[in-house]
Amino acid sequence: MNSAQIKAMIEDEFEELVEIRRDLHMHPELSEHEERTEKAICAQLDKLGIAYEAGVAGHGIIATVGPKDAKYGIAIRADIDALPITECTGLPYASVNKGVMHACGHDIHTTVLLGAARIFKAMENELKGAVKLFFQPAEETVGGAERMIAHDGLNSPKIKRVMGMHVDPTVPTGCIHLAKSRMNASTTELIINVNGVACHGAHPDQGVDAIVVASHIVLALQTISSRFAAPTTPVIVTIGTIHGGSKENVCAGQVKLAGTIRALDFETRDFIKAHVKTIAENTAAAFGASAEVIMNDGYPPLVNDVATSLAIADVAEKEIGRGSVIFMDDPSLGADDFAYFTSKVPGVYFNIGTYKEGQALPQALHNENFAPDEECIKYGVLMNVLGALRLLDEDEAKA
């Protein structure tokens, strides 16, 4: 099947894919609770006669298309969970699950991969290797990608490269947006428990005010980026919550700070963590208090393989059109657990545009009015299919 035939098939399937997307959008489910979504995906795979394993890492599914004797293959991932947001779009297919919404486009991601599955199945005998389709749960919370990989998802057959995509409401429909290398940051959860000595507000000299101590710690942490890290190195230490004190006339004895650390590589992450601990503990000690620092590493940095990124960009330029590729000037300090895949095998994560000029509803991820242009589904399917075929061709040539 050539690219013209693939494009024609996408056009033929588009109306039904929109119906699938709207059904998923109407019935969003939170991380770890994607029961209906899992069943809906399985029903579509059953119609196509595609072999799969369900119940992976909770409600995830791994499907495989291609030669039964394939010794290697590529993987494509779509996340399937929704967010705890009450939808306000007023669309006829708006969420019927109160307080839950597909506000991050995972309904689009799932639909795109199901659309690609149809084409892969139609040309199964032409595939030069296996294509494994990862319908991944729990991206928004615990990182379902890591658990799917732990399920031995990247073997049987051996996966040589991996692809993933995300909708991007800042990019026009029909364009893709990606980084050649560094794409997203790592995350580390940060908790600092400041322990002072509570006392009456009229006699602050008789205690150690934990709120004052915590305030100095918060300010001092910002010097990590301005005075310790190189000016060209992106470093983020965010304190998102401060909890302390019980009464307006009492100097607090305890304060809890919570936030995140973000970096684009492990070396910088560890550098930040060391300085956070030193600053928090020594600042507290200077005031006669103590600080307990707890740091839990989350997602690793997401780094695209340069050769794979350039291959995908070339596919877009040739098949969507010149000017359809927008390379990122700088990496994003956001995070995505697709990084677990790219930390294991070379891969590429790219964004597909969902912004349509003159669209009535505002475009913003994690927003209660998020309403992406459904035309993006066509481009997502096209890039998944033609991108996978390009990578399989390249990997066969190297074999």
Label each region the model flagged:
Residues 29, 79-81, 138, 168, ...:
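Active-site beta-loop-alpha junctions enriched in small/polar residues
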Residues 61, 83-85, 89-101, 107-108, ...:
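Histidine/acidic-residue-rich, glycine-tolerant segments that coordinate divalent metal ions
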Residues 75-77, 190-192, 349-354:
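Non-cysteine beta-strand/loop elements that form the S-adenosyl-L-methionine
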Residues 215-399:
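Metal-dependent amide/peptide-bond hydrolase catalytic core
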